[in-house]
C-alpha cells in the first residue's frame, strides 16, 4: 500500500488527501483471486472519469506487478465528510488508511 500511495501522490499531488484499503483484504478474509479494494480520497475534482483515467495506467501497472486486481474508486473530500452512501459507510467502518 505504501508504494501505491506514493505513486498516487505523484499523480495527484496536493489533491490526494488519503488512500484507504477496504473489502476482504482490509478484513483479512481474502482468498485466492480476491481483488484489492482501494478508495482514493481527493480534495476536489469536477470530472470523475478524467481523474480516474489519470491513475488507471499506474493502477494497472501495480496490478500486474503484484499479480492481483486492484479495484479503486475516487471519492471527493466533501462526499467523505457529508454523504451517507453505503460504500462510504462501509469504508468508514472497515477501511484501513495507507
Residue ranges: model-predicted function:
Residues 37-41:
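Short beta-strand->loop micro-motif that forms the acidic, two-metal-ion catalytic signature
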Residues 1-17, 27-32, 43-98:
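Catalytic core of pol beta-like nucleotidyltransferases
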